[in-house]
Design a protein with these regions (language model features):
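N-terminal small-residue-enriched
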Residues: 2-93
Length: 93
């Protein structure tokens, strides 16, 4: 079962596409560009439509999704953590 999708190999986050992702659960992702699967252990409950980090991030790092810069990290994020407004901010303003 696919739990999250990743558009490009270089993306640092995947988008959760099922409900009920729980902390401690091994989740399976599909990298669309390469048609391959990856696995990550969720460190938090992650709602459908939200992002899961695919690598560790430090404040100031840039996050890529769909091959596009979606923002700057403002709080440390570990691989498998919920990546959202609490730890990523847009660079637009």
């Amino acid at each position: 079962m696919i739990h999250f999708v990743v558009h490009e190999e270089g993306d640092g986050v995947g988008v959760v596409v099922v409900e009920g992702v729980k902390a401690g659960q091994e989740i399976v992702g599909w990298i669309m560009e390469d048609d391959k699967e990856i696995r990550v252990v969720a460190k938090n409950d992650i709602p459908i439509g939200h992002k899961v980090a695919l690598r560790d991030y430090r404040p100031g790092d840039t996050v890529l999704k769909y091959g596009v810069d979606i923002g700057k990290v403002v709080a440390p994020i570990e691989k498998g953590e919920h990546a959202h407004v609490q730890n990523i901010k847009t660079k637009r303003w």
